[in-house]
Amino acid sequence: ALADNEKTFYSIAPPPESWSAERKESYFREYNDFMLQNLTIHEAMPGHYLQLAHSNSFKSDTTVRALFGSGVFIEGWATYAEQIMAEHGYGAPQVPMQQLKMRLRLIINAMIDYRLHCEGLTEAEAMDLMTRSGFQEEGEAAGKWRRAVMSSCQLSTYYVGNLEMNRLRTLAQQ
């Protein structure tokens, strides 16, 4: 169903030239060197790239299964990869600290997803939760709010998937 051995890449776009100096500064506070290392672990190795390489080698009985992967599994694996790299000492001390911020983001994203779609969470409440409790820059939080409004349950996949990966790890260790 899918072509084998296709080339892949991962890139991080710089902030647009049209942004103000203040907005660019905020972007670089959020996407600092340590965040970019964590993001690379998540998006590339051993995160999405590794998982999808294995997934693409799986020969499914149906085209539907081959084309539509599990978002919970995909994001769960990538966030678990971040966690494992930090647990095993990858990078400077700031990398595990950044990973803890990302772990907090997983939890807050799931809360926002649920509360928005089930309890009527307002934009102001969500922004406060993300910026004050989650230490996210305002621009990042605003983008996350738009994402939450435009999709239901996607932001929760990271947290739910991570919980399941950790549950499986615990079972394997027993």
Feature-to-residue mapping (PLM):
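Long, His/Glu/Asp-enriched segments that create or flank divalent metal/ion-associated functional microenvironments
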Residues: 1-174
